[in-house]
């Protein structure tokens, strides 16, 4: 072998050995940078899990492998200790491996049965009995509505498990015909049951990840399929988290717009002022006024409202209403005359119907 070819072969061999030692690139699998936050990692997994689930890609022979790689990437990068080991030594540096069921990870985000991959929950078979659905109010802050978040819910879920013995199941009413003699029959109704394996209900701890999407609206529901009440002869019902946005001390939501009030002094209302309002995610909204600001005046800050739920690139407005704080102490006669001379404004007293048109 020529020296040049030998050198090329050695470099290729070293590259392949390095790739094997390094293992899979979990950041690339999830499509996130190495600086990604845990919220970014969860969001990426939730999105890709729906896209790559084998049930949604029956014609892709690599679908199962892709889904397993995705689960492995999430398992490692969502755990701070495993992520630290992975960042330092690669996949081979993980001490205890990562052998969690990727179906379990998927169910933490979507429930036991996942979704029918048309975007709608499973279709109910009328012949299969189902347990009751459970609706739980989930309180979220306006900060979470603005920026989004993942809320971890731990619950004890009753689950039907096989137990020793047999039991009667699928009981139903049937008609039995008995011949009493020539041309004489007796029809009786009786209960007929099948024999099924015995079951018992046990409580199992379940951890569910509820994604609070930016712009989520009050009353919206997030379903977790198969996480409701069990049914010993059929399927469990569903668990639905119903969003309840708690009141905020500074901002009020109206659609995608945010409303707030700012109190300024009488001097500021006359000569102008500058100030910053701290927004829901901590960034500052600057206000500068160099003109007279009347009590009740409103200022619109476009794009400083909440993100639209259907399109997060669109944001509402922040509407600021100004209140003027008048002096509490009585003015001296000298001060009154000074103000009159300064403003040079005569009386504009007028009585009118201020509610006309409402």
Curated annotation (Swiss-Prot):
Glycans are attached at residue 261. Residues 1-22 form the signal peptide. Residues 25-90 form the J domain. The modification Phosphothreonine is found at residue 188. Widely expressed. GO terms for cellular component: endoplasmic reticulum; endoplasmic reticulum chaperone complex; endoplasmic reticulum lumen; extracellular space; membrane; nucleus; protein folding chaperone complex. Contains high-mannose Endo H-sensitive carbohydrates. Cys-169, Cys-171, Cys-193 and Cys-196 form intramolecular disulfide bonds. The preferential partner for each Cys is not known. It is found in: Endoplasmic reticulum lumen. Induction: By endoplasmic reticulum stress-inducing agents such as thapsigargin and tunicamycin. Part of a large chaperone multiprotein complex comprising DNAJB11, HSP90B1, HSPA5, HYOU, PDIA2, PDIA4, PDIA6, PPIB, SDF2L1, UGGT1 and very small amounts of ERP29, but not, or at very low levels, CALR nor CANX. Binds to denatured substrates in an ATP-independent manner. Interacts via the J domain with HSPA5 in an ATP-dependent manner. It is linked to Polycystic kidney disease 6 with or without polycystic liver disease: A form of polycystic kidney disease, a disorder characterized by progressive formation and enlargement of cysts in both kidneys, typically leading to end-stage renal disease in adult life. Cysts also occur in other organs, particularly the liver. PKD6 inheritance is autosomal dominant. This is DnaJ homolog subfamily B member 11. It comes from Homo sapiens (Human). The gene is DNAJB11.
